[in-house]
Amino acid sequence: MADNLNLVSVLGVLLVLTIFHNPIIVYAGEGVPNVALFTFGDSYYDAGNKVFLSQRKDLPQTYWPYGKSRDYPNGKFSDGHIVPDFIADFISIPNGVLPPVLKPGVDISRGVSFAVADASILGAPVESMTLNQQVVKFKNMKSNWNDSYIEKSLFMIYIGTEDYLNFTKANPNADASAQQAFVTNVINRLKNDIKLLYSLGASKFVVQLLAPLGCLPIVRQEYKTGNECYELLNDLAKQHNGKIGPMLNEFAKISTSPYGFQFTVFDFYNAVLRRIATGRSLNYRFFVTNTSCCGVGTHNAYGCGKGNVHSKLCEYQRSYFFFDGRHNTEKAQEEMAHLLYGADPDVVQPMTVRELIVYPTGETMREYWEPNNLAIRRRPSRDFYLGLAAYY
């Protein structure tokens, strides 16, 4: 009898592990309604707008080895597709890519990318646009889509890197109060831009938190930190990220419009840290996480794609987390898209993008964002790229 009970227990454990550790396969369009995707932000989401906005003819992202994994440079800062492309594919947008808004003649019926490299929340970026300018451009184009279609479509935002990189360069000795004041200024402007989008009919928001900026290869190289991250930038990113969830909670709770306010927060900061942390990166099959695949310098972080720079190129980009000094390889981008779309509640809350799409428009959210250090895991982690190591 004891042996039988032990056998049942073992089988039960195996069943649980099988359920929660089998890879989640996202089938494009499966059970997902027809919605559009609109993206706003900087080079991480730029689908090629910088190419059409800039007067320069030698932009590095238009030259090999950018686009290497897709056989051609496509104006994106990666060896292939970026996160919005994978999300577009998951929701069956034609060709599985999101077109840049500045490219003439593109089909914008299922959405478009307003993101531009070098974009910021504050200031006046050269040959780029602030987030507010991107939102105003959407406002001017709004008549291309029905109001009811806009209400159920996705609005993805990733921006802020330029603001904090520029602040750190200009204020290397800024004290805590100066840092806090700057973060507050950035967040207030971001809040106004999201409020403007909301007033234009957007109701489903996906906000991606900032990466650990101090761990970018270009930052390690410029600040000569070796294998360590530059903590001042990481601290600024953490301060910024900590204000996003409460801000979106407030929007959702005070919404009075008939279409409501619903959102998803992607904790990109911790998703990245998992993959670049010493001793854990191999669990995700990333063998090089502190230097770039393409570039020159101590961390191969500068000059990728520039004709006047004899940059190095790694032999196998899928073993690298970073493709250039600031941007991820297609492999890393795809992992992030899967996490965001339907996987890991540790880094995506209060719901995944897939859940957000099908959530009834106008319905009050049943769950809200919670700080990670206080949140109780509602479901086992589904970061299947980590496998058994996800249980820690």
Curated annotation (Swiss-Prot):
Transmembrane residue ranges: none
Pfam family for this entry, one: Lipase_GDSL
Active site, per annotation: S43, D324, H327
GO cellular component: apoplast; chloroplast; chloroplast envelope; cytosol; cytosolic ribosome; nucleus; peroxisome; plant-type vacuole
Disulfide bonds: none
Protein keywords: Glycoprotein, Hydrolase, Lipid degradation, Lipid metabolism, Secreted, Signal
Signal sequence range: 1-28
Annotated function: Represses or inhibits nitriles production from methionine-derived and from indol-3-ylmethyl glucosinolates. Favors isothiocyanate production.
Protein name (record): GDSL esterase/lipase ESM1
Organism placement in taxonomy: Eukaryota, Viridiplantae, Streptophyta, Embryophyta, Tracheophyta
Gene, per the UniProt record: ESM1
